[in-house]
Structure formats: C-alpha cells, structure tokens
C-alpha cells in the first residue's frame, strides 16, 4: 500500500490528501508526532502542489504570532522534515514525467524505493514482529520485498518499451 500511496502523491501533484496518506503509512518512516506537525502546518497554510517543494517560511502557529526562537526552531525542523520526505517523491514524480516507456517508470519507482530505504524498513518491521512473536506476519513482510521486486522485473521484461501513461501504472 505504501508504494501505491507514494505513487498517488507523486502523480497526483502532491495534493494534501495523497501526501498525508503516504506520510501516515507505516513504511514512510515518519513518526506520528512529526506527521501531525506537518499536517497542521499544511492545513494552516494551505500547502498543496508545488508548495510542498518550496521552503516553508510562515509562522508555524499562524498569522499574528511572535517569531520567538522556539517558533523559528520549530519551523526549521518542519522544513527539514518536509525536504527529507518530499525530495524522493519529487524525484519519483520527475522520473515518471520524463519516462518514455514502462521500463523508465519501473526504474523511477525502483530508485524511489532505494532512496527511501524500503527494503531496510520492511526488514526492521519484520524483525519487530518476530520479536513480539508474530512470526507469520514477520515472514510475510520478509517476502514482500522479493515479491515486489519480482513483479517489477516482470513488468520490465514483458512490457519493456511499451508506452504507458503514468496514471495507468498505478492501476
């Protein structure tokens, strides 16, 4: 599901709903508090589209609030987190825009998965499940990366140079 939410966010031009669906997914690497702060700022300042890619400069508490050192620090941390999260999504979006074939789209998605450390996140989640006695769920997560890579390889090999509209890739 995380892969689909990332594709929705990137190919949907970063509308708030799809971005937060991705950020709230278990594999995005964003903790709940950070996600809440990003979401509050985005709603407060109506962040959508390319505004996700621009530096955030508005007060984290809204208009009329004093710029204290604490507020500046919070904004700086929010903006750093925004950059960390949005750079891979922007590269994914650009990879799909530049793609002339399904192969190029598969490569863009694979590069995104590598950038965000998806394989390592799946392994860490599987280890946590294993440690809590959820062996079956752990095994499923351990297999997920291989299944995803196999599916992408098959798409690459079979459909290769086929022209494919980005929005069809998600379906």
Label each residue range with its predicted role.
Residues 1-171:
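Polyanion-engaging groove/track-forming segments
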